[in-house]
């Protein structure tokens, strides 16, 4: 993970990073576009995830594993969104970090902690869907809210430990009367960077894709299922994979290219700028995850959709909102209908 890439920088490293920063400076137009993007992203993601988290906490009695994972996903998204205003200030200030060293470390730590936590919670949701649909009876003892909470606690601890180096290593560099926070876009790379990227992203991504391929095969080969239930499962698969492909795949592909460049050295200023711009764009896409997850809730969770209509529609819906999931039982059809 990115925390594993953070090493104590030498003077040579800082000089190289300063050179990269000078070559990668944005134009005023680029700064304005990035700032507008983060402002819109912050508003949409904050409202959507705050509403989702309130609903998940309010409906905690439903006691389903998927609800637990969705609640932790909303917490991760909301925590990640709360550091986006620092990027707004950075771009409005003309690539200058005015907050100092400690806030820079905290911003990097919180952003990457919650980004990778979101990735792993999406993977947990995929695994839960796989067990519920492909092995509905065998997984009854495993798919319990307590186990889901324990899994989430374990993931929070693991990701926090992996990101901890961001809190202890210097992350600011001064260039031409401006201070740059390295954790906003260009993390310091190390020899462990590619290996950490593989552990942090490749494993959960492959796991998620595998789960959904097996789910699709089960839906095609299994007993006859109502069309709307099958469509709901396909909708869930499409949404989660779309979030991975839009938000996380471009960033990690570009990150691998950047790490290889960093270790190679001798890159022209034009190439440095291209890499810097790529970092900014793909990082924007990762932060978009916070705005897209509530869209997923809307399409796959009936209670979220019901509550949102109650808030926005002039005519409030009558009757109690449906649960996010039905009560788990030993029926394959019931398990397939969850979410």
Swiss-Prot record:
Membrane topology: Multi-pass membrane protein
A Pfam match: 7tm_1
UniProt KW keywords: Cell membrane, Disulfide bond, G-protein coupled receptor, Glycoprotein, Membrane, Receptor, Transducer, Transmembrane, Transmembrane helix
Positions in the Extracellular compartment: 1-36, 86-105, 169-195, 254-280
Coiled-coil regions listed: none
InterPro entries attached to this UniProt entry: GPCR_Rhodpsn, GPCR_Rhodpsn_7TM
UniProt topological domain (Cytoplasmic) ranges: 58-64, 127-147, 217-232, 302-339
Gene Ontology biological process terms in this record: negative regulation of inflammatory response to antigenic stimulus; oligodendrocyte differentiation
Glycosylated residue positions: 14, 176
Disulfide bonds: 104-181
GO cellular component assignments: plasma membrane
Subcellular location: Cell membrane
Residue spans crossing the bilayer: 37-57, 65-85, 106-126, 148-168, 196-216, 233-253, 281-301
One GO molecular-function entry: G protein-coupled receptor activity
Gene3D superfamilies in the cross-refs: Rhodopsin 7-helix transmembrane proteins
Record function comment: Dual specificity receptor for uracil nucleotides and cysteinyl leukotrienes (CysLTs). Signals through G(i) and inhibition of adenylyl cyclase. May mediate brain damage by nucleotides and CysLTs following ischemia.
Similarity comment text for this entry: Belongs to the G-protein coupled receptor 1 family.
Stated name of the protein: Uracil nucleotide/cysteinyl leukotriene receptor
Gene name for this UniProt entry: Gpr17
């Amino acid at each position: 993970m990115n925390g594993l890439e953070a090493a104590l920088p030498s003077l040579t490293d800082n000089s190289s990073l300063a050179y990269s920063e000078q070559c990668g400076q944005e134009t005023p137009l680029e700064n304005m576009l990035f700032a507008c993007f983060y402002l819109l992203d912050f508003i949409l993601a904050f409202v959507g995830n705050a509403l989702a988290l309130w609903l998940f906490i309010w409906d905690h009695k439903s006691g389903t594993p998927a609800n637990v994972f969705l609640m932790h996903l909303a917490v991760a998204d909301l925590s990640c969104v709360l550091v986006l205003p620092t990027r707004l200030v950075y771009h409005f200030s003309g690539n200058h970090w005015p907050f100092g060293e400690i806030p820079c470390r905290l911003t990097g730590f919180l952003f990457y902690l919650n980004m990778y936590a979101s990735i792993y919670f999406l993977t947990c949701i995929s695994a839960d869907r796989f067990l519920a649909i492909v092995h509905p009876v065998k997984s009854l003892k495993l798919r319990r809210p307590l186990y889901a909470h324990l899994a989430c606690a374990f993931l929070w601890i693991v990701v926090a430990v992996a990101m901890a180096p961001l809190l202890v290593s210097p992350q600011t560099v001064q260039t031409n009367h401006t201070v740059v926070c390295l954790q906003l876009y260009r993390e310091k790379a190390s020899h462990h960077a590619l290996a950490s990227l593989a552990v942090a992203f490749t494993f959960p991504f492959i796991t998620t894709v595998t789960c959904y391929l097996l789910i699709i095969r089960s839906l095609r080969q299994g007993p006859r299922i109502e069309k709307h239930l099958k469509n709901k499962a396909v909708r869930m698969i499409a949404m989660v994979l779309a979030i991975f492909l839009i938000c996380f795949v471009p960033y990690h592909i570009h990150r691998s290219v950047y790490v290889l460049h960093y270790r190679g050295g001798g890159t022209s200023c034009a190439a440095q700028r291209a890499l810097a711009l790529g970092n900014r764009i793909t990082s924007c896409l990762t932060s978009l995850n916070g705005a897209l997850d509530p869209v997923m809730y809307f399409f796959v969770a009936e209670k979220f959709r019901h509550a949102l209509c109650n808030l926005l529609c002039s005519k409030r819906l009558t009757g109690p909102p449906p649960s996010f999931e039905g009560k788990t039982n030993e029926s394959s059809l019931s398990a397939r209908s969850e979410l």
